[in-house]
């Protein structure tokens, strides 16, 4: 597998509602894997599920790749040993949420945001 199937990609972009899920301003251009496909991640069944994806702008994708420590802290990247559905993500710069595999979000409270 090299990317999200069309059905999953559609869920991710519908959830984004035409806004980058990181900054909340720019139009999303790409589906970003929170847990990278490298290092064997593509063999895991949850790699190409909606909880592992964010619809993001090119500028935010570049920021994620260049500021990886920040990206892990904010849930935009997820370490290989973790399930993306269980790792909160900072969305639109202000909302901590959990992403599910149906294209939905669940708000997190203060205690849900502990670091994995």
Residue ranges and their predicted role:
Residues 4-32, 55-60:
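Short cysteine-rich loop/turn motifs with clustered Cys
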Residues 25-28, 50-74:
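Short Cys/His-centered divalent metal-binding micro-motifs
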Residues 37, 73-77:
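A short linear boundary/processing microfeature
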Residues 37-52:
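Short linker/helix segments within small regulatory modules
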Residues 76-116:
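Short flanking/linker segments adjacent to small metal-binding domains or redox-active Cys/His motifs
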């Amino acid at each position: 597998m090299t990317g999200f199937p069309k059905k999953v990609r559609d869920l991710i972009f519908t959830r984004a509602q035409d806004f980058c899920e990181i900054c909340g301003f720019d139009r999303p251009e790409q589906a970003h894997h929170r847990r990278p496909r490298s290092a064997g991640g593509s063999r895991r069944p949850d790699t190409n599920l909606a909880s592992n994806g964010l619809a993001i702008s090119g500028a935010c994708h570049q920021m994620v790749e260049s500021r990886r420590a920040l990206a892990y802290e904010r849930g935009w990247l997820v370490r290989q040993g973790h399930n993306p559905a269980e790792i909160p993500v900072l969305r639109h710069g202000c909302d901590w949420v959990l992403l599910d595999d149906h294209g939905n979000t669940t708000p997190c409270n203060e205690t849900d945001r502990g670091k994995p």
